Amino acid sequence: MTYNYLLILIIIYVIKIICRYFKQKNELQMESKTNLDSSKLVDPINQVNQINQVNQVNQTNQTDKIIVSFRGDKYDITDFLRKHPGGKNILIKNNGKDIEELMAEYEHSKNAYLILSKYKITEK
């Protein structure tokens, strides 16, 4: 009789473990569904356009020029390096890249966007 009792306890324990596993799995699935933010989804067409913009910028870059892309346009900001309040290194580091996310990440005044517009070298 004690053997049967022990066997029943083991079966109950295993069932609890299995139930806990499925409960945790379900909670993780629900959490991932609720955390899904459509604004974070990647738009494949937009991503291809950004890659093309970067490739175009890279093709036009010369070693002594700092050219960046912003909202589809290209800017030669070489002459602005010494004037940039955040230092020239961040501009050099982003040579040949799209800086739209970078501009949004660091707070810029309206004047900063006006200054950038003076360095535009191409239209969309």
UniProtKB/Swiss-Prot annotation:
A Pfam family that the UniProt record links to this protein: Cyt-b5
InterPro entries registered for this protein in UniProt: Cyt_B5-like_heme/steroid-bd, Cyt_B5-like_heme/steroid_sf, Cyt_B5_heme-BS, Cytochrome_b5
Main location: membrane
Keyword Transmembrane: yes
PROSITE patterns associated with the record: CYTOCHROME_B5_1, CYTOCHROME_B5_2
Span of domain Cytochrome b5 heme-binding: 49-124
Gene Ontology molecular-function annotations: heme binding; metal ion binding
Annotated residues for binding of heme: 84, 108
Localization annotation: Membrane
Keyword field: Electron transport, Heme, Iron, Membrane, Metal-binding, Transmembrane, Transmembrane helix, Transport
Topology of this chain in the membrane: Single-pass membrane protein
Gene Ontology terms: cellular component: membrane
Keyword check for Disulfide bond: no
Transmembrane segment boundaries: 5-22
Job description of the protein: Membrane bound hemoprotein which function as an electron carrier for several membrane bound oxygenases.
Family: Belongs to the cytochrome b5 family.
PANTHER family per the UniProt record, alphabetical: CYTOCHROME B5 (PTHR19359)
Name of the featured protein: Cytochrome b5-like protein
Lineage: Viruses, Varidnaviria, Bamfordvirae, Nucleocytoviricota, Megaviricetes
